[in-house]
Amino acid sequence: MALLQQILYKVNIISVTGPTDIEVNDLQIDSRKVSNGACFIAERGTLSDGHHFIEAAISNGAVAVICEKLPGVLSDRILYIVVENSAIAAGIMAHNFYGQVSEKITLVGVTGTNGKTTIATLLFKLFSGLGYKCGLISTVQNQIDKKIVASTHTTPDAITLNHLLADMHASGCSHVFMEVSSHALHQHRVEGLHFAGGIFSNITHDHLDYHKTFDEYIKAKKSLFDSLPSSSFALSNADDKRGSVMLQNTKAKKYFYSLKTLTDFKGKIIEDSLLGLELVINDVEVHFRMIGTFNAYNLL
């Protein structure tokens, strides 16, 4: 149970209708999953509008409703809070409800068209091998140390994501490596999270069925780095034409990697064969049981 007033910390509220001194025991964006004592957040999605299911959520036991527009008929026993953007509110509220857990771990987000899964998984395996208890959130699977958790999206919805991070923290994870898709950024699924760092791999003309224009796609990816605080790091691919654009407005400490130019992390392929990759990274020769130039970038 938590006081709703505390969960609403930093949410941009437009109006409040109904009793305010209430406690909630759950947050939901799916009216079918609402139970007694829950707060229902009506999000406007790409396929459906949560505002159409407010009445169903109340019937299932919701005691509070977060929405962008009040329904036509109000219930005297329900608290209605109108916000500017329900999706943004969901991210912030989930962050607060689960104890602002992303601030208690080292959370690193990886974005880009290609390489997200590989980079996040490599970091997970590297830090696990160094003795850290880690979490992984990826398209292939989510993992809490050695325990595998089913994955349904590249980046889960805000409530599921914060719940998962809370489980990781409760299990003793100190580091979490997460794929952050452009869809998730555009839909504010990572809103409210504190990232210790962000990594950009590359960008190509994919997902334009969703983002419509390449500029909108770039803008979505870039928003991860725009939101990073000065205490975080931002690492980008200098060989991608948009690599520097991604970091142009970030407050984070900037780093670049490259196979072509002298940067913070400079790599050179010595050999690429069926036996693996032989690389020189910042004058240190290393061998990896992976092949291909694309994996050389992922390893950097």
Regions found by a protein language model. Give the residues of each.
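N-terminal leader/targeting and accessory segments in enzymes
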Residues: M1-I92, K241, K266-E271, H287, ...
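Phosphate-binding loop of NTP-binding sites
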Residues: L8, A90-A238, R242-A252, N282
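Short glycine/serine/threonine-biased micro-segments
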Residues: V16, S35, E43, S48, ...
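Fold-independent oxyanion-binding glycine-rich loops
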Residues: L27-D30, E43-R44, K69, V83-S86, ...
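Short, well-ordered beta-strand core segments
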Residues: F40, V65, Y80, G198-I199, ...
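Positions that flank functional sites
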Residues: G72-V73, N142, H183, L262
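Active-site regions of enzymes building and remodeling cell-envelope glycoconjugates
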Residues: D76-E84, V149-T152, K251-S258
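Adenine nucleotide phosphate-binding catalytic loops in nucleotide-utilizing enzymes
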Residues: H211-I218, K222, Q248, A252-L300
